[in-house]
């Protein structure tokens, strides 16, 4: 008996070698023609073995709501069935597009340091955006006041100290209208 050897296209061979790192038999099938139906794709996949799970994805919202996303996931019963599906389907024409079949892998969340850094204002007071120099001084003054209180508490540890005063916002005075409200300005815009 001679063992039958098949030569694989280089691309398919590299895809199959990635499968040794995979746990399970889940494939990603992409570049799907929008006209291909879930039923026809499932029938095509069942030719390669028993399909345990099949996820055909659709757009959930937006202008394309209800239309296929262009890819799906399939779980086969055995690894051999999944490998056979990769060999036969990768690069094959389905309607007007060539299918792309790969081993599915978990999406890795990458932390982007630049994207997630939040720039916080120097002070969270409402006046900080209009008067940055005043807010810098008020922060410095607050730090000095806290340091002085800590020093005083260190010198007299048995004394009772009043609770910190309620934080007061330095709200700029309300601007007064220089002209009366008029509806004529609104009518001219229409």
Curated annotation (Swiss-Prot):
PANTHER family: HETEROGENEOUS NUCLEAR RIBONUCLEOPROTEIN. GO terms for molecular function: RNA binding. This is Probable RNA-binding protein 18. One of its GO terms (cellular component) is nucleoplasm. Residues 25-106 form the RRM domain. Residues 166-190 are annotated as: Disordered. SUPFAM superfamilies: RNA-binding domain, RBD. It comes from the Eukaryota. Pfam families: RRM_1 (PF00076). InterPro entries: Nucleotide-bd_a/b_plait_sf (IPR012677), RBD_domain_sf (IPR035979), RBM18_RRM (IPR039157), RRM_dom (IPR000504). It comes from Homo sapiens (Human). Keywords: RNA-binding.
């Amino acid at each position: 008996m001679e063992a039958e050897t098949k030569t694989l296209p280089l691309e398919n061979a590299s895809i199959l070698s990635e499968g040794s790192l995979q746990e399970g038999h889940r494939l990603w099938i992409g570049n799907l023609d929008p006209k291909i139906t879930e039923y026809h794709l499932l029938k095509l996949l069942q030719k390669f073995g028993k399909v345990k799970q099949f996820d055909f994805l659709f757009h959930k919202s937006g202008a394309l709501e209800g239309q296929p996303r262009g890819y799906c996931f399939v779980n086969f019963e055995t690894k051999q069935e999944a490998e056979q599906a990769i060999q036969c389907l990768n690069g094959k024409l389905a309607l007007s597009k060539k299918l792309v079949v790969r081993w599915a892998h978990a999406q890795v969340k990458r932390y982007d340091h630049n994207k997630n850094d939040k720039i916080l204002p120097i002070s969270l007071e409402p006046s900080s955006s209009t008067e940055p120099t005043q807010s810098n001084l008020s922060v410095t003054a607050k730090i000095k006041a806290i340091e002085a209180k800590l020093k005083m508490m260190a010198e007299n540890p048995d004394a009772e100290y009043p609770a910190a005063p309620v934080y007061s916002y330095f709200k700029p005075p309300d601007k007064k209208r220089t002209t009366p409200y008029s509806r004529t300005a609104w009518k001219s815009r229409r």
